[in-house]
Amino acid sequence: MTSSDPQSHNVFVYGSILEPAVAAVILDRTADTVPAVLHGYHRYKLKGLPYPCIVSSDSGKVNGKVITGVSDAELNNFDVIEGNDYERVTVEVVRMDNSEKVKVETYVWVNKDDPRMYGEWDFEEWRVVHAEKFVETFRKMLEWNKNPNGKSMEEAVGSLLSSGD
């Protein structure tokens, strides 16, 4: 590898991006994933929204997957999708296949005291109800990011994925 080669990133996902079709839209390829656990965080549902968030929690742990080999351009796509409500941070996860500790990027909810946070988010429940809409919406968001045509993201994409919780 030369210094001009693009840097590769690892991204820990724990919500809608666990769905292979959703990850494929963001990456424009099939994701290479490894199951992992993030200690020191808790995953919550968000009232009125169909996606979860994580915030720091001393006794918490979040199961998810590490997407490996993420390029700078793909990482930018994650940033676009996650928007301003999440902050990208570097954390350490434990791979479930070999117990190796790995540094990864993940997205933490900015408002750690958000009153909309509650309960446990359920991936299978989400998948049945929301997966197809997320694929369509994320595709529109990334198309808008490449060519906004003078429109705001909301104008181009429509209202983002409310759940009616």
Swiss-Prot record:
Q: What is its EC number?
A: 2.3.2.-
Recorded GO MF terms: acyltransferase activity
Q: What are the entry keywords?
A: Acyltransferase, Transferase
Q: Where does substrate bind?
A: 14-19
InterPro entries this protein is in? AIG2-like, AIG2-like_dom, GGCT-like, GGCT-like_sf
Expression across tissues:
Expressed in floral organs, leaves, stems and roots.
Record field: transmembrane: none
Q: Where is the active site?
A: 82
Q: Which Pfam families match?
A: GGACT (PF06094)
The enzyme's main class, written as a single word, is transferase
Q: Please report what switches on or represses expression of this protein.
A: Expressed constitutively.
Q: What does this protein do?
A: Putative gamma-glutamylcyclotransferase.
Record's family?
Answer: Belongs to the gamma-glutamylcyclotransferase family.
Name the record gives this protein? Protein AIG2 C
Species per Swiss-Prot/TrEMBL record: Arabidopsis thaliana (Mouse-ear cress)
Q: What is the lineage of its organism?
A: Eukaryota, Viridiplantae, Streptophyta, Embryophyta, Tracheophyta
Gene from which this protein is expressed: AIG2C
